[in-house]
Structure formats: C-alpha cells, structure tokens
C-alpha cells in the first residue's frame, strides 16, 4: 500500500488526489493529510496562534472527510506554521512514499510565494508532486 503525505492549506477533495496520482492508486493508498497552522503576520506579532490552529483543524478535518467519502483511506494532522517543518515532523512518524503539495491559485496562503515546493523537493528524499486545485 502506497503511503502519501498530503500538505494542504485549504480543504481538498479526494477527486483532486485521484486526478493527481490516478483513481486506483489513490483508492489503494493510505493518506496522511497535514494542514499547517499558517499564521498571518499580524497574528504572529499579537502572539495569538489559536485562529491559525483552529483553521488548520477545520482544513484537515474537511479534507479527511472528503477523501473518505470518495473511498480514500485518510487521517489528519495539524502541523507547524512553517510548511517545511510540518512536513519534516510528519515524516518523523509517517513513512511516506510520496509527498503531494496542494495549492490554490487564489489563496493568500500560497506555498509558491515562499518557494516551499522547490525547498521540499530539495530537502526530502520522497518524490514531491505539486498540484494546483480550484476551491
């Protein structure tokens, strides 16, 4: 069984994963959904991480529910605010075969701005796939 680590900043459907890696492969995979607790800069300065944690919890729960409804074995986890640290922490306990980074074209939480996709590909031994999905 293939193990996939999916990093999401917004809720993602099982269909998005199926279109990314193939329907059969997605339905036979075990997926760990990681939603980083992404802080807006002003929240960081106010030292109030709760809204970011609450949002990450919502994102991972909704993503896991969507994937399970579409026949994908998924579990969720809230990660560090730094997406690379969130991936690193998850990989310490979850032996993923592949990392899939989901971004949204209009999201203010885009990992692209910070070069997260390229950095993840350089840092981790697993193949990294980047998928842009509509909301």
Positions of the model-derived regions?
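Glycine-rich, Arg-bearing micro-motifs that act as flexible, cationic patches
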Residues: 102-119
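Structural beta-alpha unit
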Residues: 70-98
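Structural motif
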Residues: 3, 98-100
């Amino acid at each position: 069984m293939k193990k996939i680590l999916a990093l999401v900043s917004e809720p993602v459907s099982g269909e998005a994963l199926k279109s990314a890696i193939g329907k059969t492969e997605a339905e036979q995979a075990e997926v760990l959904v990681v939603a980083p607790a992404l802080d807006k800069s002003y929240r960081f300065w106010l030292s109030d991480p709760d809204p970011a944690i609450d949002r990450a919890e919502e994102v991972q729960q909704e993503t896991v529910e969507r994937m399970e409804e579409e026949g994908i074995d998924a579990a969720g986890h809230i990660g560090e605010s730094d997406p690379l640290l969130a991936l690193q922490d998850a990989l310490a306990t979850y032996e993923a075969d592949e990392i899939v980074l989901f971004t949204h074209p209009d999201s203010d939480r885009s990992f692209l701005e910070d070069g997260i996709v390229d950095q993840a590909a350089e840092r981790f031994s697993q193949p990294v796939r980047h998928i842009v999905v509509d909301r």
